[in-house]
Amino acid sequence: MEAPTSARQMRRLLDAVLSIGAQLDLATVLQRIVEAAQDLVDAQYGALGVLDDSGDGLSQFLTVGLDGEERAAIGPTPRGLGILGVLISDPRPLRLTDLAAHPASTGFPANHPSMTSFLGVPVMVHGRVFGNLYLCDKLGGGPFTDSDETLCVALATAAGVAIDNARLHSRVAELVLVEERDRIARDLHDTVIQRLFAIGLSLQGVASMSMPGEMSERLEEAVDELDTTVREIRSAIFELHSTRVGRSSLRRAAT
């Protein structure tokens, strides 16, 4: 009979939850989740697959345990087939002693390290699958345990909360940025453009007076430059407003 989760393991879980919850940037949260999962269950390799908008494949695949060269040698980001696809179609914890023995196994691509034991856990946000944690090859040999699965499920629950919190923070920051754009646009239009326009009218009035030709030409050049500046500011205002249109969804922006 397997030993229950120890106090040491619970402390590691608490540390992992706190480290994830302390982050506000979603990209950082996602990377920290997979790092924490790998450390928590003593896995040699870990990954977090983020589902795409259709929910049928992966849009992002974060890994630990592989260096940059090894990751690049494997090739494109997995699409969510084989064992990875099992958790996508059936989002429940999956623990395997030997990956290759599972009927859904399709083997590994070229240059992929050999992996044997496997633990997969879905990460839910508001009752919907956001992605899946994949852990492979428990350090020291042997399969992942019941305790490992329990710890990983608990971590995934905390991860869902941290992801939701980070997405909310991103949305708030985005709204603040939009409001700041609007404020800048109003200031440019209501204050800066009006002042430049008034200065331009004054200079035109002075240029129409009788004065040496050189001075009149310089005033006309100044008026032309002010006109150009006003047009550029109006273009900038248009750009500030247009950036609000067609913004991507939180999942696409975050991943």
Write out the residue ranges for each language-model feature.
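Hydrophobic residues embedded in beta-strands of well-ordered beta-sheets
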Residues: 56-59
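Short loop/turn segments at beta-alpha junctions that line or gate ligand-sensing/allosteric surfaces
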Residues: 51-54, 64-65, 74-81, 92-107
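A short, aliphatic-rich beta-strand micro-motif
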Residues: 83, 116-124
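Coiled-coil dimerization/phosphotransfer module
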Residues: 2-31, 35-40, 44-47, 61-62, ...
